[in-house]
UniProtKB/Swiss-Prot annotation:
The modification Phosphothreonine is found at residue 197. This is Chaperone protein DnaK. The gene is dnaK. It comes from Christiangramia forsetii (strain DSM 17595 / CGMCC 1.15422 / KT0803). Residues 631-641 have a biased composition (Acidic residues). Belongs to the heat shock protein 70 family. Pfam families: HSP70 (PF00012).
Length: 641
């Protein structure tokens, strides 16, 4: 049976894990690392690189290297202007007000780009397991809205994965933490500060039940923002000194981003760090260099507002769960940004206890997703996960009011109905405007869909009975229906296009992703064949040089001719010329090999001081030329390595 893999699709890094027996295993990628940078690069020749190879070439190719694409997932272009101004690549407005990344004149959706990262994760798992992988559990920030969840699901589909479950990142972390503590009753807080998003979830664990009591967060707060304060500090100082804004030069901005990220990481273990960027830009007076020393205390001053911002959702989540700080038994830190000492200090000061160091903040979410995959396949028993919807759901009613049907932090799956009526006499239809958010007025919340119920019989206002039903599945994805009780006529909407993509667009992107995968496979096959040809040329020349005089001319000549043919074919880099040339040299080699190996055996025998010794006897026996065993003398010899 096919395995269900768990994928943590992160803003900065991604990770994949799978259940092996009763234990979750994090799978290292082709580069040998357990996490993969969520970076995609479009390089010359049409090749697409993902992960470390993409990140390594970012400085020289900043406008075609895509990072932090998760910040655009499921958002409108009009909501993403701040993020768009912070990245070196070009973000434009697409259909349905969706953000699109422009590469060589083509517009890519965030879902397509995320799918490329997911394809890398899928391939990593397939190489490790030795079988095709078609199903996955993918994690999202707990505070992702319906559009962002849909966009993530679509990215999975484009990557060729059936997304069995969308699971909240803090919930996944709690699963990983609590799998071996199922018998203990405890309340835990999961503080999850990743590269682009922040979540806090309060959970209750006991008897194998993982129940989310409340969740809160900020989908625009993460490690990128901590990098940004350093980038602004460095760029502002450089502008004061040189009157040049490095943020306007994509290559300089990319170097600043990498330097800021490195400095942030170093300041987690050092009291100060030096940023040294030679030749960061140039003017008519010559090259300019950026050299700056930053102390940890300076970084903490710059990031103070961000740290404070993260604590507000924590207070709200505790309040929504009806708990006080002292009720929390354990605090778990998730996400690479929780390595920042100031974050750890603030969390410890708030809860009055040291956070648990028992989980790896970079891997724990993927491990939890793999466990959920195991629950779905039946490999993991006695675990029940009860998650919640992060935001309230409602519809717009008379006066532009947001009337909530399902409150935030309601356990899912759930279903709720409420009856409404018309606002005018003889109203033939009603528009159902579906909203997600906590604000009292409709305009202040996120629209996740609209649909109409037609054919209402003419009657005075307030007479028709329109029943509106919200149905949220275990993925947190919403279906809304409206029924006229008098006629039984109904209309429903599964909020599919809330991410801005139609089914046709998703299908088209799936086909393109498959084509890219085929192209990648062909590229690898070509590289392998070129390497094989190169190795064959080297080995043939070496063998002819060493043992050519031991081979008769009639057998050596076909090898030399085939070698020349292979060299010419190798220069063309065309497989249809290299493959037959390789076949030809292999065939020519076969006929010459008997004399070649015989010569080689004699040379080795000579090296051991025993011409015609045991090696020759062994080779002769293989070739059928040796005499009976009576003529073979047993000798002791030392293998020369």
């Amino acid at each position: 049976m096919s395995k269900v893999i768990g994928i943590d699709l992160g803003t900065t890094n991604s990770c994949v894990a799978v259940m092996e027996g009763s234990e979750p295993t994090v799978i290292p990628n082709a580069e040998g690392k357990r996490t993969t940078p969520s970076v995609i690069a479009f390089v010359e020749g049409g090749e697409i690189k993902v992960g470390d190879p993409a990140k390594r070439q970012a400085v020289t190719n900043p406008t075609k290297t895509i990072s932090s694409i998760k910040r655009f997932m499921g958002n409108k272009y009009s909501e993403s202007s701040r993020e768009a101004g912070r990245v070196p690549y070009t973000v434009k407005k697409g259909d349905n007000d969706t953000p699109r990344v422009e590469i060589d004149g083509r517009l890519y959706t965030p879902q397509e780009l995320s799918a490329m990262v997911l394809q890398k994760m899928k391939k990593t798992a397939e190489d490790y397991l030795g079988q095709d992988v078609t199903e996955a559990v993918i994690t999202v920030p707990a505070y992702f809205n319906d559009s962002q969840r849909h966009a993530t699901k679509e990215a999975g589909e484009i990557a060729g994965l059936k997304v069995r479950r969308i699971i909240n990142e803090p919930t996944a972390a709690a699963l990983a933490y609590g799998l071996d503590k199922k018998s203990q009753d405890q309340k835990i807080a999961v503080y999850d500060l990743g590269g682009g998003t922040f979540d806090i979830s309060i959970l209750e664990l006991g008897d194998g039940v993982f129940e989310v009591l409340s969740t809160n967060g900020d989908t625009h707060l993460g490690g990128d923002d901590f990098d940004e304060v350093l980038i602004d500090y460095l760029a502002d100082n450089f502008k004061k000194a040189e009157d040049i804004d490095l943020r306007k030069d994509p290559m300089a901005l990319q170097r600043l981003k990498e330097a800021a990220e490195k400095a942030k990481i170093e300041l987690s273990s050092s009291s100060q760090t030096e940023i040294n960027l030679p030749y960061v830009t140039a003017t008519s007076s010559g090259p300019k260099h950026l050299v700056e020393t930053i102390s940890r205390s300076k970084f903490e001053q710059l990031a103070a507002e961000l740290v404070t911002r993260s604590m507000e959702p924590v207070k709200k989540a505790l309040s929504d769960a009806g708990l006080s700080k002292s009720d929390i038994d354990e605090v778990i830190l998730v996400g690479g940004s929780t390595r920042i000492p100031k974050i750890q200090e603030e969390v410890e000061a708030f809860f009055g206890k040291k956070p648990s160091k028992g989980v790896n903040p970079d891997e724990v979410v993927a491990i939890g997703a793999a466990i959920q995959g195991g629950v779905l396949t039946g490999d993991v028993k006695d675990v029940l996960l009860l998650d919640v919807t992060p935001l309230s759901l409602g519809i717009e009613t008379m006066g532009g009011v947001n009337t909530k049907l399902i409150e935030s932090n309601t356990t899912i799956p759930t279903k709720k109905s409420q009856t409404f009526s018309t606002a005018a006499d003889n109203q033939p239809s009603v528009e159902i405007h579906v909203l997600q958010g906590e604000r009292p007025m409709a305009t202040d919340n996120k629209t996740i869909g609209r649909f109409h119920l037609d054919g209402i019989p003419p009657s005075p206002r307030g007479t028709p009975q329109i029943e509106v039903t919200f149905d949220i599945d275990a993925n947190g994805i919403i279906k809304v229906s409206a029924t006229d009780k008098a006629t039984g006529k109904s209309q429903d909407i599964r909020i599919e296009a809330s991410s801005g993509l139609t089914e046709e667009e998703i299908e088209k992107m799936k086909k393109e992703a498959e084509a890219n995968a085929d192209a990648d496979k062909q590229t690898k096959e070509k590289v392998d064949k070129l390497n094989e040809a190169d190795a064959m040329i080297f080995q043939t020349e070496k063998q002819l040089k060493e043992f050519g005089d031991k081979i008769s001319e009639d057998k050596k000549k076909p090898v030399e001719e085939a070698l020349e043919e292979l060299k010419k074919a190798y220069e063309t880099k065309e497989l249809d010329q290299i493959t037959p040339a390789l076949d030809k040299i292999n065939e020519a080699w076969k006929t010459a090999s008997e004399e070649m190996y015989k010569a080689q055996a004699e040379a080795q025998g000579g090296a051991n001081g025993q011409p015609g010794g045991p090696q020759q006897g062994a080779t002769g026996a293989e070739g059928g030329d040796a005499k009976s065993g009576d003529d073979v003398e047993d000798v002791d010899f030392e293998e020369v390595k």
